[in-house]
Amino acid sequence: MKIRYILFLLTVAFLLGSCATPKVAYFTDLKRGTAEQVLNPLEIRVRPEDKISILVNSKDPLLMNLFNLPIISRQIGTTSGTSNSQGISGYTINKDGDIDFPVLGHIHVAGMTREEIASYIKEELVSKNLVKDPVVTVEFMNLTVSVLGEVANPGRFNIDKDKLTLLDALSMAGDLTVYGKRENVLVQREENGKKTLYQVNLNSGYDLYASPVYYLQQNDIVYVEPNSMKARQATVNGNNVRSASFWMSLASLLTTITVL
C-alpha cells in the first residue's frame, strides 16, 4: 500500500513538472501607473564601416548637385524579367572614422549621431559661404541588429531611427514565442574589439530599464533562449512526453499501481 502511494505521488509530480506553465508576462514587478527612469538613453553613433547617406537641400539646384552624390540606378531581377531601381549613393566611414565629403574634404564623423553630423556639415557650409540656406539630412544605410532564437520571425533588421530599444527589436521580430525564456534574454555587443554578453530579465522592468543594453547599438545580436518546455521537446525523452507510446506507458504504470 505504501509503495503504491509513493509511486502515485511520483507520477503526479512528474506530470505537474512536465506541464509547468512558463512565465510569459513582462514587467511583473512594476506597479501600474508608476513611472520608472530609464538609464543610459543612448543614441546610435556611427562607427567605421557604417554607411550613411547625406543629402543637402538648397533653393539653388546647382548647389544641390555640387554637394550631393549621384543617384545610382540598379537592375533588379524579377520573375517577369528585370526592373530598374534608383537609390542614393552613400558614404562608407573608413577605418579612421572619416568620410570624404564634396568640397569640404575629409570629415571625422565616427562617434557622432545623425543630428550631430547634419549640424556640423550645415555649419561648415554656412561658415565657408558655400551655401546660405542648407538643409542637411543624414540617414543610416547599412546599420542592423539581429534577433535569434525563440521569436516569431528571427532575422536581421535595419536601424532607421536614432534610438532603438531591446523591446523595439523584439517587436520587429514578432515578439517572443511561448517557448522563449523571458528571464534570460542575451545580448551580444562588440566593444573595443571584444564581444561582451549581457543578460536581461524581461519579467523584471527594473532589470530591463537599468540594463546597459536596453538601448541597442548597431551589430548587436539578441538571442532568446528556449525555456525548459522547449528544451524537453528538443530531446528524445522530451519528445516522448507528447507521443502516444509515452501515454500508453504511463497508463500501464497507473494500472500497475492500482493493482498493487
Put a short name on every predicted segment.
Residues 1-19:
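Sec-dependent bacterial lipoprotein signal peptides
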Residues 2-3, 19-260:
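Ser/Thr/Pro/Gly-biased, low-complexity, turn-/loop-rich segments
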